[in-house]
Amino acid sequence: MKTIDLFAGCGGMSLGFMQAGFEIVAAVDNWRPAINTYQQNFTHPIHELDLAQIDAAVSLIKTHSPELIIGGPPCQDFSSAGKRDEGLGRANLTLDFAKIVLAIQPAWVIMENVERARLSKIHQQACSMLGDEGYSLAQVVLDASLCGVPQLRKRTFVIGHRHGSIADLANVLQQRLAKQSLTVRDYFGESLDTDYYYRHPRTYERRAIFSVNEPSPTIRGVNRPIPATYRMHPKDAGDVSLARPLTTKERSLIQTFPLDFKFVGTKSEQEQMIGNAVPVNLAFFLATSLQAYLNQPRMQQLSLLPSFF
C-alpha cells in the first residue's frame, strides 16, 4: 500500500510500517535535525515543509498518490506535562492533518497522538471532519508495552477507511495485544549490565529509579544525569547508588529502533527526536494488525477494496 508519513520525525512510524511490508513513498516534517536523521536511514524522500501550509502540502502530497496517510500531529498542547492548552497553536495541526487528508482522499488514514488527546475538542473535531466526509473510523488506545515495546507508553490511534465500515477493527487490535507487559529485561536480557536505572522525573514528587524487571516509563525528550542532591522517593525501585542513567542509544533501543539506526545532531536534538518518535514495534503492531484485518474474508469480499498485500 503506497503510504506517506506526515509529521514523520526521525522515522519510527515509517520504519514500523516498512517492516510490515507497506511502501513508504515519502515523508514530510519541518524540523531539520529529524529530517537529517531520517535521510540517514531511508532511501525514499522526506520533504521539509510546514504542514500548516495546507495548499502547499496538498500539492506536494498529491504527487505521490498515497493510498494511506499516516501521521502524528505534534501533541505538546495535549500532553500531560502541565495543563492542556489547545489554544497554543500546535494542536491546530491536528485539524490541518484532517484537512489535508480530506483534500487528498486516500483510502486509509491513521492518526496518532497522546492518550489524552482523544478527550480534546480539537481531536474530536478532526474526527468529526473525517466522519462527515465519509470515513468510517475506529479509535483505540494502545499501550506499547503490550505491543512488543518494553515501555509503558499509551497512545491514541484513529484509523479511517473511505470504502466501508471498519467498526470492528478496534476489536481486532485488542485481540492481538500481548497478555502481559514486556519488561526491559525481557527485551535486553542482561546486556544493560544493571538492575536499576535513572529516568529524570517531571517533578521530584515522582520516582526516578526503575527496575529492569518492569517496563520502562515513557521515554521523553530529555535525558539528564542523576543530581548529586537526589533524594530517594518512597517508590524508587532500588537505591540510587545502584542506578545509572540510560545512554542515548539505550533510550533509542527502548523505543525499539534497531541497533544500526543512525541518529545525527546534537545530543539534546537526538534525545528529543527519540522521545518524540512512535516506537517502531508499536507502529509494526498497528501495521500488521491492519494487514490481518484486511485479510479477513469479509474484507476481501468488498468490491471497492483493492488487494494491497
Curated annotation (Swiss-Prot):
An example of a Pfam family matching this protein is: DNA_methylase
Q: Which residues form the SAM-dependent MTase C5-type domain?
A: 1-297
Source domain of life: Bacteria
Keyword Glycoprotein assigned to the entry: answer is no
* NCBIfam families xrefs: dcm
Described function: A methylase that recognizes the double-stranded sequence 5'-GRCGYC-3', methylates C-? on both strands, and protects the DNA from cleavage by the HgiDI endonuclease.
Q: What is this protein called?
A: Type II methyltransferase M.HgiDI
Say which species the protein is native to. Herpetosiphon aurantiacus
